[in-house]
Amino acid sequence: MNSKVIHWQDFDLSAFGIAKNLQEKHNCDLFTIIDIPNRPKKFFQEQSFVKYQKKWFYHDHISPNKKPDIEYLKYIEKNYKIDIWKIAYNDRIFFKYNDFYKFTSDEVLSIIEQSCKLFENVLDEINPDFLLMPVTNSGRMHIFYEMCKAKG
């Protein structure tokens, strides 16, 4: 049976090159969460360099203006040992000095909740053996890393 590798793809294409090389040299099934804006999305939808078993486009799973489920977020903090507000305060998008948009507390929690639900669904569906990602550079990426680590 092939190893299952979940790959986090963002704007840094070096991870994409590593995934391609990994697939060429090892028997593994690659899955990916693609965290990019809509403009470059078409490339990842149509590319044939890396054959992913399944891919999730992160932004397709995030909707604005949803009321956060506080009980679910407490469950995430407890089961995965994640301090949600600590991560949110350090996120470059939610950061209080972001001049482009000021997120409300509900917006922040809603986005984090939707992210966690996506990540839980992905991890439950594929049960990966390995995680391939660069150093975390966003709150959502760090939450995914922590959830993978907690699941073992």
Language model feature labels by segment:
Residues 1-5:
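Extreme N-terminal starter segment of soluble prokaryotic enzymes
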Residues 21-114:
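Conserved N-terminal ligand/cofactor-binding loop architecture of enzyme catalytic domains
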